[in-house]
Design a protein with these regions (language model features):
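Pepsin/retropepsin-fold aspartyl endopeptidases
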Residues: 1-150
Length: 150
């Protein structure tokens, strides 16, 4: 699967809880595609998987890495993972594990390693907030340049 993708989620301002959440999938094989809840996090350099999901998927670590998170550092397992976005595009990633996600409703935190592969935008009109991601990138989104061109 190597198709362009577009993800768009629209929220009412009152529905936003400080983060963007989408329903995505982990691809194990053609007969094993697991639905997950993913939080998009521009403050995270890499994608993170919950310890609970590691156990559920039966993943084995390929190594260890030091991870910095909210003022603390810890050693984390590193795993190969295939993230399926918009049920179209598979991203083969090396992700770290965190038990901090276990107490949330999130299975995966999508970091800048994925976000920087495409175009990412959040816009607001009135009470509506729109999150969009497209892959591959179709060029820079530059609001200042758009104003100059008007």
């Amino acid at each position: 699967m190597n198709e362009p993708i577009v993800i768009t989620e629209k929220y009412k301002e009152s529905e936003i809880i400080g983060c963007i959440i989408t329903n995505e999938h982990i691809y194990k094989d053609d007969n094993n595609i697991i639905p997950i809840k993913a939080m998009w996090d521009t403050g995270s350099s890499g994608t993170v998987i919950s310890s609970d999901l590691v156990k559920k998927l039966g993943l084995s670590p390929i190594g260890k890495s030091m991870v910095k998170s909210s003022g603390s550092s810890f050693k984390s397992g590193v795993y190969n993972l295939e993230l399926l976005l918009a049920e179209k595009q598979i991203f083969g990633l090396q992700v770290t594990e965190s038990d901090q996600l276990n107490n949330s409703d999130m299975d995966v935190l999508i970091g800048m390693d994925v976000i920087t592969l495409g175009d990412f935008a959040i816009s607001t009109v009135g009470e509506e907030i729109c999150f969009s991601f497209r892959y591959p990138s179709q060029g820079l989104i530059d609001f200042k340049e758009q104003e100059i061109e008007k």
